[in-house]
Amino acid sequence: MDPVTPLEQALHAARALVLADLVAGQVAEADVVSLVEDSVVQRRWWVEQWPDGVTYVAGLVAQDVQDALLERYGRWPLCPVCPTGDPHALDVEPELGPDPHWVCHKAGVKVASVGSLGRATGGTASS
């Protein structure tokens, strides 16, 4: 058995973090999980081309899934910080960097790290 490469470790971690946030938001249906898998496949190629980008994969997968959900179903994840006014989605920051987190630009606050939305929203916490 071959050892797990840093690339595979990063991809598995990104998958797990984004799935944890989808579960916390109760939107981890089969078709949505397929969006995660599609992103992981695309990002595998991306990191193979630019190995230094391996630490950015979790944030990029979160953004990919967020964009795909917006096109198909609507905004995700909805901001838990701003209960009044128009519902709006959280954004991933940094857009290209390590240690991604969800932020509400309207309130100007960090809500949760990618993978930890359950703690911030009262949903299922990631382990």
Give a label for each model feature:
Residues M1-T55:
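N-terminal alpha-helical interaction blocks
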Residues P51-S127:
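Cys/His-clustered metal-coordination modules, chiefly Zn-binding fingers
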